[in-house]
Amino acid sequence: ILLKNGENMGIAYALNQILKYAYENDVKWFLTLDQDSVCSRNLINTYSKYIEIPGVAIITSCIKDRNYELEDSFRENEEYRFVTYCITSGALMNTEICERCGGWDNKLFIDNVDGDICINLKKRGYKVLSLHYNGLLHEVGHGKNVKFLWKKDIVYNHPAMRQYYMARNQIYVARKYPEEFSMYKQLKKELKKIWLVILFEENKWEKCKARIRGVKDGFRLDIKKENNK
């Protein structure tokens, strides 16, 4: 099935289209992938072993990025754990639960779309299950590991427009869920991101302007009302 739009409506809108199709066609679970992601051959078979765990809304796995090193937080013999957040790509979504929670927030367009729905699900008592299993080869921007203030960090080298949405949506989601986020800490994170751009990325001025504009618009954007199904 190919669902087409006449214009770019954003990732959140497209995910809601998939959710609507799955719900109307009695599809119990559906897998979401980015265009540049490669999933392991046994991903669905592996995920299917865990779909009966009560309250699980999303199943995800460990991710390997093409450009930089990600730390494995799992203990050696740990089979899985419940987490608060996962990226959209490589996530197996429970159709009924996602529909009940109102799906994705179209106002986000792109970036933090995944974080928003994870928080929404958590607030309603549902869980995100992460498997100790390398299920996805992925690429976030053109990332690389760097040292900032003597600590290991990552810069993603996203273009200015993407930087705008990243900053805007971080502030918007923090406003949407004030019980989950400290706005003071979010603004500190944004300041750090700007410093990382200045120190390690190209097109610094355009990207910094975009992030500052994103922060301002994040405070202006009207909050989506929750679906109380």
Q: Could you say what each language-model-derived stretch is?
A:
Residues 5-24:
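Glycine-rich, basic loop-to-helix element that forms the pyrophosphate-binding segment
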